Amino acid sequence: SPLEQELVSQADALLGGDDAFLIVDDTAFPKKGTHSVGVAPQYASALGKNANCQTLVSLTLARDEVPAMLGLRLFLPESWTSDPTRLARSGVPEPRSTYRTKPEIAIEEIDRLRAAGLRFGCVLADAGY
């Protein structure tokens, strides 16, 4: 989107370069219900256990002490992607309705950021990636 492109351009101008790091992580949001898109029992690192939650894959550009979040994508567990009725009822767009692992989502986002001209020296991620 134009907004994402502008965000990447500004972040690159301020932080981009060989000494910048692209940090890949995921964030879990605990949920009590079952209707929020992507909610399912899954590992929530903030809680240190499996819990009913939504999980997002994030990509942040950082140099020195300055971070800029450039990507945040919802992870859909197989319990969601294998249920076309649930996906349609929730309004999940067709391109996002197929199952992708968190590392696959991260690679798609890295490719998107590189194609947009973002410069970074290396990617940092935990063992889950």
Question: What is the predicted role of each segment?
Answer:
Residues S1-L124, G128:
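Conserved, well-structured functional cores that handle cations and Mg-NTP chemistry
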